[in-house]
Amino acid sequence: MVHLTAEEKSAVTTLWGKVNVDEVGGEALGRLLVVYPWTQRFFDSFGDLSTPDAVMNNPKVKAHGKKVLGAFSDGLTHLDNLKGTFAQLSELHCDKLHVDPENFRLLGNVLVCVLAHHFGKEFTPQVQAAYQKVVAGVANALAHKYH
């Protein structure tokens, strides 16, 4: 559960309504793979991830980034039940994929950076604070199965 004030919730949903999930998702996942290259080990089937350009232009990275942000969008409509919303994904990432749960926190922080880049002055410190709460809540929900 993420505790947001009415103002924070409004800021998150208003900005999210302007997000191009295809573009931002691919960029966020791509940046995760470039900035934290050890995360690439989970994406062996994605082909060429040998350079930053290869990662950022990789169609499989872009497609999976879109999928990730689609799940994140779903979470935004269930802020009061993030653990339930992400239960199946938590189980998949824990039991089958064996993803280090720290990667969820890293991706959340990268997403905040990408949103700041895309929205500039509109991404005020108050908006950032609200998004940091949300991405922390999502990361916690995704890591739930690990506990």
UniProtKB/Swiss-Prot annotation:
InterPro entries: Globin (IPR000971), Globin-like_sf (IPR009050), Globin/Proto (IPR012292), Hemoglobin_b (IPR002337), Hemoglobin_oxygen_transport (IPR050056)
Positions with a binding annotation for heme b: H64, H93
GO cellular component: blood microparticle; haptoglobin-hemoglobin complex; hemoglobin complex
Modified residues (Phosphothreonine): T13
Residue ranges constituting the Globin domain according to the UniProt record: 3-147
Source superkingdom: Eukaryota
Disulfide bridges in this chain: none
Modified residues (Phosphoserine): S45
One Pfam assignment: Globin
SUPFAM superfamilies registered for this protein in UniProt: Globin-like
GO molecular function: haptoglobin binding; heme binding; hemoglobin alpha binding; metal ion binding; organic acid binding; oxygen binding; oxygen carrier activity; peroxidase activity
Modified residues (S-nitrosocysteine): C94
GO biological process entries: hydrogen peroxide catabolic process
List of residues that carry N6-acetyllysine: K60, K83, K145
Tissue expression: Red blood cells.
Residues modified to N-acetylvaline: V2
UniProt keyword terms in alphabetical order: Acetylation, Heme, Iron, Metal-binding, Oxygen transport, Phosphoprotein, S-nitrosylation, Transport
Family: Belongs to the globin family.
Subunit structure: Heterotetramer of two alpha chains and two beta chains.
Task performed by this protein: Involved in oxygen transport from the lung to the various peripheral tissues.
Protein name (Swiss-Prot/TrEMBL): Hemoglobin subunit beta
Name of the gene encoding the protein in the UniProt record: HBB
